[in-house]
């Protein structure tokens, strides 16, 4: 990203993948916490930012859960036109891959707020380390579920080895290029 770009707009990602509704079709408490954090961010933007009209909430959830979460956001005062429910994300890494491909096309990228359980901060950090220069902020919500449930969610979020392999190949190629630049004579001697 070039240095002369400025932030234009806001994208709030409310991450609610892999949730199970309670028996009475109610949202679990940890999702209600995420909705509360999302609503606070939305209200803060609406009260203070000049680019508030260019704000969208990208809700990552399944169809059934997404409609219930959307209704809760509407009850909290969020405009319906600002909410987009997307159920095609496999995990946090996939979400950012798709989102950043769209954002890179914009001349001035938006500020991105990622709302999830605070236990997913390390996954968020790993996923977003490749997007330096963009304003991406983690907003953690409390998650009081048992550790087993949280760890089960984390297993679903594991970054694929494919991403790691691509990074390793890129690093190896850079090292090779650097060594070839530093020691160009070694290659010439070997080929003779």
Residue map of PLM features:
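C-terminal capping/extension of enzyme domains
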Residues: 146-192
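Non-Sec secretion/translocation targeting segments of pathogen effectors
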Residues: 1-3, 191-192
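A structural signal for short, hydrophobic/glycine-enriched beta-strand patches
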Residues: 2-160
């Amino acid at each position: 990203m070039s240095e002369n770009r400025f932030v234009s707009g806001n994208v709030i990602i409310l991450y609610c993948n892999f949730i199970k509704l309670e028996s009475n079709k109610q949202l679990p408490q940890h999702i209600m916490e995420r909705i509360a954090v999302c609503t606070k961010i939305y209200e803060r933007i609406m009260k203070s930012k000049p680019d508030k009209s260019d704000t969208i909430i990208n809700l990552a959830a399944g169809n059934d859960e997404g409609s219930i979460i959307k209704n809760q956001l509407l009850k909290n005062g969020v405009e319906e036109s600002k909410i987009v429910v997307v159920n095609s994300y496999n995990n946090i890494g996939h979400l950012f891959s798709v989102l950043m491909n769209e954002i890179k096309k914009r001349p001035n990228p938006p500020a991105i707020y990622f709302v999830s359980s605070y236990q997913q901060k390390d996954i968020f950090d790993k996923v977003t380390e490749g997007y330096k220069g963009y304003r991406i902020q983690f907003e953690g919500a409390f998650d009081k579920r048992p550790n087993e449930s949280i760890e089960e969610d984390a297993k679903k979020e594991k970054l694929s080895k494919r991403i790691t392999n691509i990074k390793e190949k890129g690093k190896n190629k850079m090292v090779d290029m650097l060594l070839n630049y530093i020691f160009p004579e070694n290659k010439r001697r070997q080929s003779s």
